[in-house]
A protein has these predicted regions:
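Residues forming the flavin
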Residues: 1-278
């Protein structure tokens, strides 16, 4: 297996990874490699077509793809070696990486390793919603990918569970595309997204927000036909009061993120029992 020595290896080509790689090169590291398993740099930015990115770095409001393109250009201008379509299979405690691409496997020995793998969305199984398992249950990021990158409309009558920022933004996006967002249900007594997104994405479009409320059952066989909502008592203390059935064809989940920490574990990095991250 071919072996390569570098000063800094950055795993993950999203915004954090690009910033880390460019900063390492600017700070004097001569051999910096940026490893990304996808076919382009930018990570989640590539599907975030709303603006508001780049105000601090570039001094103007950019869409996610614009921000990713400009930062990728900055990375390449600093002479960082970018390995796309390349997966990191293992990271040892002595900073030795095993990577794989269509060109085969190789080993990279690094003076320093920067972990920028990001996170993934919590799926339905992680929150244990009872009911059947029909089509029509999506995480907000998947809905964003389908609509913004693939031009696929996921449904017409949508209930959103969770008030994370991506969920709020996609509730607005779905409404703009002609769907009916029946409500956003949040199990906590407050929203988890930014206040400005609540105003701009829900209030401005007349989308109801139900706090201390969650989905307690999903209905449908082949496709979602509806969900049952129920109020939750203080501190999540069980269902309080009656339940409400809403007929819908889609349930969109925006219920938090899980760190991509498998490589961190392999490298022997200590992880928080609360967040699952370093």
């Amino acid at each position: 297996m071919r072996t390569e020595d570098v000063d800094v290896a950055v795993i993950g080509g999203g915004p954090a990874g690009m910033a880390a790689a460019a900063s390492a090169r600017t700070a004097g590291a001569e051999r910096v490699v940026l490893i990304e398993r996808g076919d382009r740099l930018g990570g989640i930015l590539n599907q975030c077509i709303h603006d508001g990115f780049g105000t601090k770095v570039f001094g103007e409001a950019l869409t996610g793809p614009e921000y990713a393109q400009l930062y990728a250009r900055r990375v390449r201008e600093t002479d960082v070696s970018c390995l796309l379509d390349t997966a990191v299979l293992d990271v040892s405690s002595n900073r030795e990486l095993t990577v794989c691409s269509e060109k085969g496997m190789r080993r990279i020995r690094a003076g320093a390793v920067v972990l920028c793998m990001g996170c993934r969305e919590r799926p339905r199984g992680a929150i244990r919603i009872p009911g059947t398992r029909p089509a029509g249950v999506f995480t907000a990021g998947v809905v964003q990918d389908y609509m913004n990158l693939r031009n696929i409309m996921v449904g017409r009558r949508i209930v959103v569970l969770g008030s994370g920022d991506i969920g709020l933004i996609m509730a607005r996006r779905l409404t703009l595309e002609g769907a009916k967002v029946l409500c956003v249900a949040e199990i906590l007594p407050y929203t988890s997204g930014l206040a400005r997104n609540v105003v701009q994405c829900l209030d401005d479009f007349g989308i109801p927000l139900h706090l201390s409320t969650t989905v307690v059952k999903i209905h449908g066989t082949e496709r979602v036909t509806g969900v049952t909502l129920a109020r939750i008592g203080p501190k999540g203390g069980g269902v309080r009061g009656g339940s409400t059935y809403l007929a819908c064809d889609t349930l969109m989940l925006s219920v938090g993120l899980i760190p991509e920490n498998e490589l961190s574990k392999r490298a022997g990095v200590g992880l928080s029992p609360v967040t699952g991250g370093p």
